[in-house]
Regions:
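Transmembrane helix-loop-helix hairpins at the membrane interface
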Residues: 92, 118-226
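Short, Lys/Arg-rich, polar N-terminal cytosolic tail immediately upstream
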Residues: 1-7
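Cytoplasmic juxtamembrane interface segments
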Residues: 54-74, 145, 204
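Alpha-helical transmembrane segments in multi-pass membrane proteins
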Residues: 10-61, 107-111
Length: 226
């Protein structure tokens, strides 16, 4: 019992550290000092550190996912493909309001990613934003806010909370255009939450998130953006 409480406390500290990192390193530093380089470097370094720590803290859940792949590989593939297609469809639908109302608006999160790609080396950028960043976000928004929190709250509340926070997390301004352009994050969050709840494999959302981010970075490389 004491050991379980200790683990829960450590994971709570992990979530708190993530919140502090995002609010101070990204938001406050960017708004107060108006220095995007320092803000992005803090974010990249923090994602690398928190990603490694998170993998260690949630190693039991990750091992469970790996074991699930070994035992039910076909089932995992079906869930992954189904989730990917569903996410693409829902994200496209969620993107319509932004395209209709603000067709020329570029999301501040995308601008930040492009800026980061130009400021740091490609290997560091891919490691932080393509691999460890998604892992960290999945541990926070899906592992903790859904898989763990559903023991205390109804699953539907956990899904709504996780998905809304996941969307807000990617907003860099409290404006209607910024809200609209991040609606696809809300739909993606819902899809990933459903996977956590019903697939019995917690690593699927991680793999999909990493795949989506690294694919986007590959496109940026091919287009000469980074």
């Amino acid at each position: 019992m004491v050991k379980n409480k200790s683990k829960a406390s450590i994971k709570t500290i992990y979530v708190t550290a993530y919140m502090i990192m995002f609010i101070f390193a990204v938001k406050i530093r960017l708004l107060v000092f108006h220095n995007i380089y320092y803000s992005l470097m803090c974010l990249i370094i923090a994602y690398c550190i928190l990603g490694v720590i998170g993998i260690y803290l949630f190693r039991k859940e990750i091992r469970k996912g790996v074991a699930e792949w070994k035992e039910h590989f076909t089932n995992g593939i079906i869930w992954s493909i189904g989730a990917y297609i569903t996410d693409m469809i829902l994200s496209s639908l969620a993107n319509y309001p932004s395209m209709a109302l603000y067709p020329n608006y570029d999301g501040m999160n995308d601008i930040s990613i492009s800026s980061a790609a130009k400021l740091v080396s490609v290997p560091l950028f891919v490691t932080a934003a393509g691999i460890l960043g998604p892992i960290t976000e999945e541990l926070i928004f899906r592992f903790i806010l859904v898989d763990k929190l559903r023991t205390k709250l109804p699953s539907i509340i956990c899904v709504i909370l996780s998905s809304v926070l996941f969307m807000v997390w990617h907003m860099h301004a409290l404006t209607l255009p910024e809200l609209m352009i991040n609606l696809p994050k809300l739909s993606t969050g819902i899809v990933y939450c459903v996977i956590i709840l019903y697939s019995n494999n917690p690593t699927i959302p991680i793999l999909l998130h990493v795949f989506n981010n690294t694919t986007a970075m590959l496109m940026m490389l091919m287009n000469g953006t980074i």
